[in-house]
Structure formats: structure tokens, C-alpha cells
Amino acid sequence: MTCKIIGSGGYLPSKIVSNDELAKFVDTNDEWIRTRTGITQRHIAGDTEYTSHLALKSAEKAIADARVSVNDIDLIITCTTTPDNSFPSVASKLQGYLGLTNIPSFDLQAVCAGFVYGLQVANSLIASGKYKTVLLIGAEKMTSLLDWSDRSTCVLFGDGAGSVILQRSSDDSGLIDSNIFSSGADYEILYTNGGVSMNGISGKIVMQGQKLFRHAIEKMQQSIEDLLHANQFSVSDIDYFIPHQANIRIINKLAELLNIEEHKVVKTVEKHANCSAASIPLALSTLKASGKIKKGDILLFSAIGAGLTWGSALIRW
């Protein structure tokens, strides 16, 4: 028994900040950013536009795409590291926005790997037989965690949300398998220098870029190879590779090491920047909207985030 994606939707805030605009108040330039990251712009949420608002916009699109009633949803999981409040959860607020009552709703925090984590959790809960229609969301307002004087981090991130509707599969489509991992010993590679129990503030992003690059390549490659081997798949079986959209150099290097053909690699980092847990569902929504995916296609997701947390998932469309 496995779950399948029956609908998807993405939302990006209307405000777009190009590299040239960013260079007006940050010591950087368009060439420096593009060469190192592949990013040309990012979407930034307004001061009164919160993660729950982004989540709602993407959820409404996914519900419409799935052609289900909002009342069919019996579980909400929101993957985020930028909640509106310390409590309640974004998922709980979203439940209220959607007019739903008495269904379980909770947030999952695995940063950039959140959507892959959430997919495995949602699949397990659907497999239990207790839930039939799950709304799984990746939503982030990452710009709220940025130190705008630190050009090594502030140029990388954007805001956005992506959602999917999951139901139990009645055929061979759906989640084939997934794996998730963490390594707490490496937490200082990427973290925020604050937190509720630490100092009462959210803090700003601190990153050791070169170390993170090496870990990203190593851990995502191993995760993918293990997943393919465990399920007797080869790289040639993959129709679309949707990696976490953190940095074009990571994406390209990973595709090169795995021998994944260029036309199979989905890249949205140029326009979206790094939207953390939202990046994979946003990229999926973009791919689906292009009309390229067809029934039976094999999709490969893979992500790594702070924690360190990472994992991969294989899906038959």
C-alpha cells in the first residue's frame, strides 16, 4: 500500500528582487551571484505576508488541481522552518483558513529536506488506513531569517510554497520507496544563531558554504544510489530528477556524478532561489504545469538541509 500525488500547486509572492536590485544594498553583483549559485532573482513575501498565507495559496491550487473537495482532506502536514508563530503550528492555522475542523494538523521541521521527510511520514500514515486524503505542504518565508549584510547567505534564499494532495494508490502509481537520514554532529555547518529556548529570537542563518557543498554532494549521491539499488532501478529508468533547488553547482555536479541526462533534470533555482522545504514541491508544480509529465513516468526527489537532514524518494506518476 502506497500513496500517490493526485494534485499539486505552487505559490510565489508577487515581489521579485533581481540580483541587480539586491546589489543596491548588498556588497555583491549579478555576475558574482550567478556564477556561484545560478540564481538571477528571488521572490520575497511582504511584511504582512506570512508562511501560513503562502501555504494557503499553494494548498488552494493543489486542491483545485486534484479535483477534490476541501472537506475530503483528513490530515494536514506542513513542512516549514519559518512558522508564523512559535505556536500554534502553521498547519493548525491553515486548517482554520480552509474551514476544516477536528482533523489532525501538524508541522514537520527538517528544513530543506522537509518535503522528502513529509512524504515518507504522510505515506506511512496513509498506509495505516486511518487517513485517505492528505494535504502535504512545503512553505517558507526564508527571507525572515536572513542577515542582509552577509552576502554569502542573503543572496541564496527566497520565499514560496508548494503543496500536493496525496491519496492511497489503487494501482502501481505512487511512492515506490524513500529514505531519510540525519547527522546531528554536523549541525554547525548550517544553523540559525538564535532560537526560542536559546535567546528568545529566531536568529539569522549561519552557513559554512564549502563544507555544506561537499556534504550535499556526498550525502545526496549516496542516498540516491542506495534508493535505486534497493528497488532494482537504474539511473536510465529515471524520467525526471527533481533535486532540492539550493545551488546550480550542486545540482549540476550531482547530475554529472549520477550520469543523469541534462533534459531530465528539473531546475528552478534560477528564478525561485532556495525556498527550503518548498523548493521540491514548487519545482514539481512547475514541471507538471509544463505538461511534460505523463502517466508511468519515474520521478526522483532528493534533498539535503540543516541538521544535517537528507533523503530521497522515487515516485511512479
Swiss-Prot record:
Q: Where found in the cell?
A: Cytoplasm
Write out the ranges of the annotated region (ACP-binding).
245-249
Q: In which pathway does it act?
A: Lipid metabolism; fatty acid biosynthesis
Predominant place of localization: cytoplasm
Q: Does the keyword Cell cycle apply?
A: no
* Gene Ontology terms: biological process: fatty acid biosynthetic process
Q: Which InterPro entries match?
A: ACP_syn_III_C, ACP_syn_III_N, FabH, Thiolase-like
| Family per similarity comment | Belongs to the thiolase-like superfamily. FabH family.
This protein is called what?
Beta-ketoacyl-[acyl-carrier-protein] synthase III
Q: What organism does this protein naturally occur in?
A: Rickettsia felis (strain ATCC VR-1525 / URRWXCal2) (Rickettsia azadi)
